[in-house]
């Protein structure tokens, strides 16, 4: 009797397991990470263009014509909120520039509270050793680049937006010491892995204060034969 009960229970478990497999086959499939969130390979890191100079992403190269409405660590803020000097939505649609040469890791809608987001990975070389940092551009209106694109310092990559109407237009700008791209919280008490954006760019500008204007940074247009 006990043996019959055992075999019946075993048959029931096997039957229910098979039924679950047939009704929900997706549970048996391997999961795959979004390619945008995979760690770049050593080859991809080695092929990154070197960033020899950094400039500010909004206004002029050294940050004029824009102001910092909420600074790094203020209210646990993980970046700088950059606005046009007119305030409110006066900078809506203004150009956002890549702060340095690099490669776009992510360019897409970041979800609620973010609007469009772009993340660019930069390689810095000093004494033969490479260091990698990310520049992060949040609340963009229009995205002008795709993931995988190489960009140059001063290249327009987006326009200033409102996170789909959630805020007055501004650029949420971060600098990070990460390789893998992720959207992030925007606010966090611990800032490990995040850099003070204004301080970082000021230290890596490699140009005098009077060096303004972005002409000459973009590839020259190809003339028709």
Regions found by a protein language model. Name each.
Residues 1-13:
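N-terminal Sec-pathway targeting helices
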Residues 13-23:
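Hydrophobic alpha-helical membrane-insertion segments, chiefly the h-region
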Residues 22-116, 125, 153, 162, ...:
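Surface-exposed, glycine-biased beta-strand/turn segments
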Residues 90, 97, 128-154:
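Short histidine-centered loop motifs in beta-beta connectors
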Residues 112-122, 169-172:
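Short aromatic-glycine-enriched beta-strand elements
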Residues 121-126, 180:
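Short edge-strand/loop segments of extracellular domains
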Residues 160-172:
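Active-site loop architecture of trypsin-fold serine endopeptidases
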